[in-house]
Swiss-Prot record:
Residues 1-16 form the signal peptide. This is Mytilin-3. GO terms for cellular component: extracellular region. It comes from the Eukaryota.
Length: 174
C-alpha cells in the first residue's frame, strides 16, 4: 500500500512537470529518455525515505513496528547480478519459502526478474529493463496481490551493473 502510494505520487509529480501543469514544460514532451530519467530519480528518492525510528521500550521486547503489516519480520534482500549470467540464460533463486526467476535476453542487453512469495494470495513482484545502453536505459516494474506492501529496485542508468539492482521483499514473509 505504502509503496503503491509512493509510485502513484512519483508518476503524478513527473507527469505534472512533463506536461507543464505548473507552467512551461521543463523539456520537450516527446523526449522519452528524459522522462524515464526523471521518473527513476524521483522514484528512488521517495523509496529511500526512511520511516521514523522510535526506541523500543525494554519492557516490551515485542513492540510492534510502525507499519503493523510487516509484523516485525526483518527485511529480506536478494541481489541478482546479471553480468554473471550468459546471454539467453535464466536462473532460479529462493528466499524463505518464496521462489523467483531471473533471466537475461539473448542479445545480452536486457534482463528481468519475477518473484512469488509462496504465501498464497497471488503476491508477487517483477521488474525488467535494459542493462546497458547510454541514453536508452528504460525501467519497468509491476506488483500484484492483495495487501502487497513491499519491493524495492535500484537502477543506475546506462551502467551494465544496473541489474545488481537491489530487490528487497519486505512483508512477503509471514
Amino acid at each position: 500500500m505504502l509503496k503503491g502510494i509512493i509510485l502513484i505520487v512519483t508518476i503524478q509529480l513527473v507527469n505534472a512537470n512533463f506536461f507543464g501543469v505548473f507552467g512551461k514544460p521543463l523539456y520537450n514532451p516527446f523526449n522519452k529518455d528524459k522522462y524515464m530519467i526523471d521518473f527513476i530519480t524521483t522514484f528512488n528518492k521517495l523509496m529511500n525515505m526512511k520511516q521514523p525510528q522510535f526506541p523500543h521500550p525494554k519492557s516490551y521486547p515485542g513492540f510492534p513496528p510502525l507499519f503493523p503489516g510487516i509484523k516485525g519480520k526483518k527485511s529480506v534482500f536478494k541481489t541478482i547480478d546479471f553480468t554473471d549470467m550468459a546471454p539467453g540464460s535464466k536462473k532460479t533463486f529462493r528466499v524463505d519459502n518464496g521462489q523467483g526467476i531471473a533471466f537475461r535476453s539473448k542479445s545480452g542487453n536486457a534482463g528481468g526478474m519475477s518473484f512469488s512469495s509462496g504465501t498464497g494470495g497471488g503476491k508477487g513482484f517483477a521488474f525488467g529493463g535494459t542493462l546497458g545502453g547510454g541514453s536508452n536505459g528504460e525501467f519497468v516494474m509491476s506488483q500484484s496481490g492483495p495487501g502487497l506492501k513491499g519491493g524495492k529496485v535500484t537502477y543506475s542508468k546506462g551502467v551494465p551493473k544496473f541489474a545488481k539492482g537491489l530487490f528487497g521483499m519486505l512483508p512477503f514473509f509471514k
